Amino acid sequence: MSIDFKDISVVIQGPVQAYQGRSQEPGITHKCIASIRTHLPGATIILSTWEGQDCHGLNPDILLLNKDPGATIVSYNAKGEPGKLNFNRQIVSSAEGLKQVTTPYAVKIRSDNFLTSNDFVAAQQAFPARNDASKLFTQKVVTNTSYFRRYADGQKIVMLPSDFFHFGLTEDLLKIWDIPLFPDREFDPTKAGSPQYRGAPKVGPHAEQIYCNAWLRKLDSTVPYLQHRHQNSPELLAYWERFIASNLVVLEPEQIGLGLIQRFIPKSKRPNEICHQDWLLLYKQYCDPSIAISKFDIFKTIGWKRMCKLPFSYIKHQLTQIKK
């Protein structure tokens, strides 16, 4: 079944100007909108941003000026100074935009990314096999390998998908983004003088892990609360890999047709990130044994780099923990 572009809405979420803590390439949101008009003619464009943002010259079909929830306090350092991340800004701009969608399919894209093709539309249905016991989405959701990490500090980790780009059924994207806002972390005076954050004194989860853990626990009550970055077990890793194979289609940016601004483009593929071949191997293992992919195929591209770099990353992390 082919998907007609008129059955797709594109939610562009985030700021269209720089603000404190978030730089912005001038004119990038104009470029994003123009690229959608070029590569998805007939699709509905929804720009979901903040009150006070200068949207002059932008021409989305729907413009949402959300009330800015502000940055979220997620930590305190030893001096009691708060650390903030844009958790709720991303949730509000994504979820409120998706709630305006009336088409069966939707794209969620950052306001500082853009399209270079529409290849992701066909790719969404190119891998139909599922592991029935692991299905949490109605259909597959296409996502991006950039910042989709399989390793951190030389160790395999779980629940760290990229949040740059999603394409799939609107109902499935809402499963990811329509989650409760995160409350500010309250300062605990009994822990004054020590860092306070989720998982302390172990290494805290990455922001993407915290997002993913929240929506995955909403979909499946058996998923544990992720206390720290490296929390893992053979059972949890297998669960995460089955989920990836059965519910996602993980593609390189060029396979999606996703354009990234310069600061997101590495000089070479990062060994700690998933690659499309990694995902294909999981898809073969859990969904479709007929897929032609092997571990040696991965070794020839990114595997040998991992063998060289990951052990050093692990040793460096262990030494850092000892110094603490």
What are the roles of these predicted feature ranges?
Residues 7-12, 36, 44-47:
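Hydrophobic targeting segments
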Residues 106:
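Short aromatic/hydrophobic "clamp" motif used to bind/position activated sugar donors
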Residues 28-43:
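Short, acidic, metal-binding catalytic loop of nucleotide-sugar glycosyltransferases
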Residues 265-324:
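Membrane-proximal basic amphipathic "stem/tether" segments
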Residues 1-30:
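N-proximal low-complexity "stem/linker" segments adjacent to membrane-targeting elements
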